[in-house]
Amino acid sequence: MNGNVVMKAKDTVFAALAECFVTIGTRRYNFMQAINLEAKFEKNKTEVPILGKTGKGNKASGWKGTGSATFHYNTSIFRQMMLQYNETVEDIYFEIQISNEDPTSGAGRQTMILMDCNIDGGVLAKFDADGEYLDEDMDFTFEDFKMPEAFKDLEGFLTN
């Protein structure tokens, strides 16, 4: 494989070098409590029968956005959302902005903004007499997203 271009180890993005902001209404929070977050885009597909073929085709027919996060149990902003829903039946939608940037990587910076996020539920109260620290998990959905900053193509990635 002489001449094969390979990725440089330094171009990986260090996992902890990220920023996360949550915007609820007019308030923007530096969500430094986050331990991890993952947002997924899943296309809905419809099977399409095609005359003259033994197999079926697949046509995209929409999408859904889902996510999950784990964060330190030291903020009440999501419990306040649940309390407001319980008291008023008004559901709260919010934005999450995630940026990944490792200054030692040639990939640069990527920023994703998840819009119209909505929590599925959450922890109201918690303790662990045998634990070291408290954290909590949260699942959520989102209805739109944008990417104002994209990673750069690494050297050798684009071949034509």
In which residue ranges do the predicted regions lie?
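Intrinsically disordered, low-complexity terminal/linker regions enriched in Pro/Ser/Gly
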Residues: 1-5, 149-160
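Surface-exposed flexible segments
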Residues: 33-36, 87, 106-121, 158
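Short, acidic/charged, Gly/Pro-enriched secondary-structure junctions
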Residues: 82-113
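Short intrinsically disordered coil segments
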Residues: 83-88, 133-135, 153-160
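Short, surface-exposed polybasic-and-hydrophobic patches located at secondary-structure transitions
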Residues: 141-144, 159-160
